[in-house]
Curated annotation (Swiss-Prot):
Disulphide-bonded residues: 31-81, 40-64, 56-77
Organism: Pseudechis rossignolii
Name the record gives this protein: Kunitz serine protease inhibitor Pr-mulgin 1
Taxonomic lineage from the root: Eukaryota, Metazoa, Chordata, Craniata, Vertebrata
Keywords in alphabetical order: Disulfide bond, Protease inhibitor, Secreted, Serine protease inhibitor, Signal, Toxin
Family (UniProt): Belongs to the venom Kunitz-type family.
Main location: secreted
Tissues expressing this chain: Expressed by the venom gland.
Extra information: Negative results: does not inhibit serine proteases (trypsin, chymotrypsin, elastase, kallikrein, plasmin and pepsin), cysteine protease (cathepsin G), and MMP (1, 3, 7, 8, 9, 10, 12, 13, and 14), as well as voltage-gated potassium channels (Shaker, Shal, Shaw, and rKv1.1/KCNA1). Does not inhibit vasopressin V2 receptor (V2R/AVPR2).
Any one GO molecular function term: toxin activity
Entry-linked InterPro entries: Kunitz_BPTI, Kunitz_BPTI_sf, Prtase_inh_Kunz-CS, TFPI/VKTCI-like
Function comment: Specifically inhibits MMP2 activity (EC(50)=100 nM and Ki=60 nM).
Amino acid sequence: MSSGGLLLLLGLLTLWEVLTPVSSKDRPRFCELPADPGPCNGLFQAFYYNPVQRKCLKFRYGGCKGNPNTFKTIEECKRTCAA
């Protein structure tokens, strides 16, 4: 296979990995945690996975501590937790 063909294959595999949803058995356990703004007083938009609604939702993050179910972008939340 030519180097161009290998590069195309690598690109397609990477795209497939990014776009493939996480199955519930592969979902990290921290995705079940509730949204936690943390103790700080910042007003940052963040996203968390809501297991009841089975989707990523917005919430206000204080900027420190909180829990691992806190994402800067909805894409990162979906990639990590959404089924």
